[in-house]
């Protein structure tokens, strides 16, 4: 397999952490669409949202997805990447999609402990636990629909990588 592997899921599910470890295990390159967008725009996610609103952010997110989708690469996508049908179609057509599932309570705990919390603008203006429940209600079907593989993201990252390597029959680097 040389096609890109796209990691999808809500904020805090481990897309970046697991994606980096999976890329290392495969000898692939790793890229995070949010970080790619920050480098190309010179703005943080919060700055893009403040300057261009969520529609502008989603447009930039789609552009980043297409720019980074190259062979031998693991791509951590933004939590809302699945909101646009064109992104879901693109990922399914151009790679393998892995959904890292974690319950809302777990996601909220991780986000509260995250040092990057200030860079992640609130989607709803509600407390993080309520927000994550609302986000999963809105997006769960989209994550499930786009995914080739669904993985329990409450496991340690190394266990998730091991599971993916076995399930996807991926050769180690």
Swiss-Prot record:
Gene: aroL
Subunit structure: Monomer.
Name of the protein this chain belongs to: Shikimate kinase 2
Effect of residue 15 to M: Loss of activity. Increased thermostability
CDD domains in alphabetical order: SK (cd00464)
GO cellular component: a single term: cytosol
Catalytic activity: shikimate + ATP = 3-phosphoshikimate + ADP + H(+)
Annotated stretches, region: LID domain: 112-126
């Amino acid at each position: 397999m040389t096609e890109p592997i796209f990691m999808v899921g809500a904020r805090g599910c481990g897309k970046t952490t697991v994606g980096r470890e999976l890329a290392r295990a495969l000898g692939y390159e790793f890229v995070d669409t949010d970080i790619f967008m920050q480098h190309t725009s010179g703005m943080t996610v919060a700055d893009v949202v403040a300057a261009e609103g969520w529609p502008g952010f989603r447009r930039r997110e789609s552009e980043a997805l297409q720019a980074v989708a190259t062979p031998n690469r693991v791509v951590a996508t933004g939590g809302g990447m699945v909101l646009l049908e064109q992104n879901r179609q693109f990922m399914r057509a151009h790679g393998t999609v892995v959904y890292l599932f974690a319950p809302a309570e777990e996601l909220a705990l991780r986000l509260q402990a995250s040092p990057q919390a200030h860079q992640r603008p609130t989607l709803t203006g509600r407390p993080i636990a309520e927000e994550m429940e609302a986000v999963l209600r809105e997006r769960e079907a989209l994550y499930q629909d786009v995914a080739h593989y669904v993985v329990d993201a409450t496991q340690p990252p190394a266990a998730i990588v091991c599971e993916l390597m076995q399930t996807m029959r991926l050769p180690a680097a």
